[in-house]
Structures are given as structure tokens and as C-alpha cells.
């Protein structure tokens, strides 16, 4: 094991971040793609705060040809160009679409995607070794309401 700090002298912050990143498997420079640049996808692009913690969105894709170009400093391509424009070092995709979800996931897995952040509210299958993190705001609000009611009863 590595020694990250020295007694009475503190920590070398860069060394600590690099060491923790290695231990936790975080690259801190992940290339992320976004599928779906509608209202939610655009909000995600605009927010894009994870570029300071885990990486950044390097490309977005949408089925609307009118969205091709650049938004918030990120290149946006038509979904038909996914295979030809896919960043080769990308392992994470954010899904913010409502149609063709399984087909899109299948295409992403063929390209080597290993992690999916899912905003789709759709059920889809992934192969072994692909991790999915579902984000459901409705469920989060329901859980919050339950906790608040529980606190009120105490």
C-alpha cells in the first residue's frame, strides 16, 4: 500500500487524488457520450459539472438532424453517424432518449461501452460486464416524501 500523507505535514493533494483514483478505478478523465439532446439532454450538456470530477461529455447524438453542430461546447452528431464518429476511448454513455432504446444500447455495447447512465424509463438488456445506473427523478421524489413523512411522525 502507498503512503499518501506524512505526519505533521499533510497530504500531497495530487498524489492523493491519483492514488485514490487508481484504488477506486476512477480515471477522472473519462470520455462520456450523451445520447439524446432534447430538453433533458440539453440540460445535462449545460450542467456538465462532472468534467471536474470524473471526465467530460465529448460528443452528443440525436435523431434530429437540426441539432447537429455544437451545443455548450460539445459536438452534436446525428445518431446515424454514431459508429463513424464514436470516440474510441469512450466507455460511458448517458441515455436521455425515449425511442429505440434497446437498439441504441446494442449499438453502444458493440462499440465497447461499459457503463450506462439511464434516464430512459425503459427496460433494456445489457451483456455481462456492462453496468447500468438508472436515474429516476420520480422515484427520488417518492423516497424523499416517505422520509419526510417518517420524520414528521417521530
Describe the predicted segments one by one.
Residues 120-122:
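Short, ordered loop/turn segments at secondary-structure junctions
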Residues 1-111, 127-154:
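Hydrophobic, well-ordered beta-alpha structural blocks that scaffold small-molecule cofactor pockets
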Amino acid at each position: 500500500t502507498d503512503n499518501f500523507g506524512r505526519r505533521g505535514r499533510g497530504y500531497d493533494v495530487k498524489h492523493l487524488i491519483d492514488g485514490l483514483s487508481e484504488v477506486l478505478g476512477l480515471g477522472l478523465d473519462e470520455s462520456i457520450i450523451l445520447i439524446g439532446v432534447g430538453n433533458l439532454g440539453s440540460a445535462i450538456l449545460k450542467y456538465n459539472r462532472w468534467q471536474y470530477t470524473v471526465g467530460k461529455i465529448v460528443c452528443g447524438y440525436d435523431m434530429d438532424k437540426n441539432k447537429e453542430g455544437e451545443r455548450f461546447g460539445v459536438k452534436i452528431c446525428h445518431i446515424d453517424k454514431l459508429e463513424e464518429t464514436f470516440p474510441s476511448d469512450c466507455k460511458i454513455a448517458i441515455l436521455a432518449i425515449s425511442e429505440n432504446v434497446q437498439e441504441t444500447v446494442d449499438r453502444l455495447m458493440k462499440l465497447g461501452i461499459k457503463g450506462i447512465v439511464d434516464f430512459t424509463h425503459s427496460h433494456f438488456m445489457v451483456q455481462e460486464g456492462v453496468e447500468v445506473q438508472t436515474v429516476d427523478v420520480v422515484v427520488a421524489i417518492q423516497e424523499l416524501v416517505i422520509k419526510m413523512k417518517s420524520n414528521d411522525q417521530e
